[in-house]
């Protein structure tokens, strides 16, 4: 596991819309080659075996990305919303208060725990970002913003900047990142069957207090081959929760990488690509980038058995079952697009 120090720079109604599981789930640099090194591989007994760290450019064909990305043409992300491949972009600069998020997002939750942040240290770019707060309590709570797509997509890229505050000490179920889903109307605890829904969230998992907060980066996935009624967690090393002793076949081109824990209090650039498979083929894919470097590339995936099941929304969230100390998470500079976006280029 690597403690990465890069860059500077969901429950009831929310469960229904975001598809986060609320049960006992085991739960900026320019583009370039990945810099982490270490062990990786498919877990065969609760740990990770040795293996090769993934390499490759941030775009360069991985996950269908184009080298460099959309953002390189829009320094400071200025005008990026006008790019023909961009579906949505929000720098959070237009909001006077949290209730104004309804102007551009289709759903927001826990507005009494949501704030437009203006402190310099809590904004990645410009003058504002969005802040989600989780108060100290032993009851489940989810903050989120959700965008419903006008045109559903077979594949999509989602990039955002985010940081945890330094007080985060959450252990166990917590959905704390961004992601996308296809018609997750039935809510969590209903397995994907190839026709009803799928969901992918790029987040962090901390199963034990002995692990550093906020836990290891992973994708939380509802797919037809999931191992429980709750979603699976795919880690860059190839480890899959639950049942880590059971390998998962990510295809012959999968290169096990390093399971990464980000540093609290630092901004990171996260990017997620989801490509739904062709029905009756295993060509679905999930690709993750961190600060423009490839973090994980999961292939050989099956999300659907019918081509009418497409991505119809994306979200940013901060959810937990049990919060020992009040903690906050910040988001800024979110872009959804049809091709690789990449980190923001300085203006």
Enumerate the predicted regions with their spans:
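Flexible glycan-contacting loops in extracellular carbohydrate-active proteins
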Residues: 298-332
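Extracellular carbohydrate recognition
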Residues: 282-287, 322-333, 346
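Ser/Thr-rich, Pro/Gly/Ala-heavy low-complexity intrinsically disordered linkers and tails
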Residues: 18-69
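Trp-centered recognition loops
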Residues: 153-155, 161, 255-273, 283
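Secretory/extracellular carbohydrate-interaction modules
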Residues: 109, 123-245, 335-344
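Extracellular carbohydrate-recognition regions
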Residues: 63-107, 200, 347
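Extracellular glycan-recognition surfaces and repeat-rich motifs
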Residues: 98-129
């Amino acid at each position: 596991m690597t403690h990465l120090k890069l860059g500077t720079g969901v429950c009831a109604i929310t469960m229904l819309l975001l598809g986060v599981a609320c049960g006992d789930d085991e739960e900026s640099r320019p583009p370039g080659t990945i810099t982490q090194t270490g062990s990786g591989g498919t877990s065969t007994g609760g740990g990770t075996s040795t293996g090769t760290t993934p390499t490759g450019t941030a775009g360069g064909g991985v996950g269908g990305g184009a080298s460099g990305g959309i953002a390189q043409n829009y320094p400071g992300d200025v005008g990026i919303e006008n790019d023909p491949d961009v579906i949505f972009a929000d720098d959070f600069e237009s909001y006077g208060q949290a209730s104004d998020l309804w102007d551009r997002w289709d759903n927001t939750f826990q507005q009494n725990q949501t704030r437009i942040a203006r402190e310099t240290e809590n904004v990645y770019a410009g003058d504002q970002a969005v802040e989600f707060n989780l108060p100290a309590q032993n009851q489940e709570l989810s903050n989120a913003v959700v965008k419903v797509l006008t045109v559903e997509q077979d594949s999509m890229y989602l990039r955002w900047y985010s940081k945890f505050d330094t007080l985060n000490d959450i252990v166990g179920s917590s959905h704390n990142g961004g992601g996308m889903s296809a018609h997750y109307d039935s809510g969590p605890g209903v397995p994907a069957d190839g026709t009803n829904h799928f969901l992918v969230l790029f987040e962090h998992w901390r199963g034990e207090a002995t692990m550093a907060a906020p836990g290891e980066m992973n994708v939380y996935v509802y797919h037809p081959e999931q191992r429980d009624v709750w979603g699976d967690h795919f880690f860059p090393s190839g480890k899959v929760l639950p049942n880590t002793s059971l390998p998962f076949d990510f295809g012959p081109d999968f290169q096990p990488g390093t399971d990464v824990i980000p540093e609290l209090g630092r901004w990171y650039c996260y990017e997620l690509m989801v490509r739904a498979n062709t029905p009756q083929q295993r060509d679905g894919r999930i690709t993750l980038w961190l600060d423009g470097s490839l973090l994980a590339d999961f292939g050989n995936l099956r999300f659907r058995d019918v081509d009418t099941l497409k991505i119809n929304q994306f979200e940013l969230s901060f959810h937990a079952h049990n919060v020992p100390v009040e903690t906050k998470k910040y988001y800024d500079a979110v872009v959804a697009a049809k091709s690789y976006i990449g980190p923001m280029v300085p203006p």
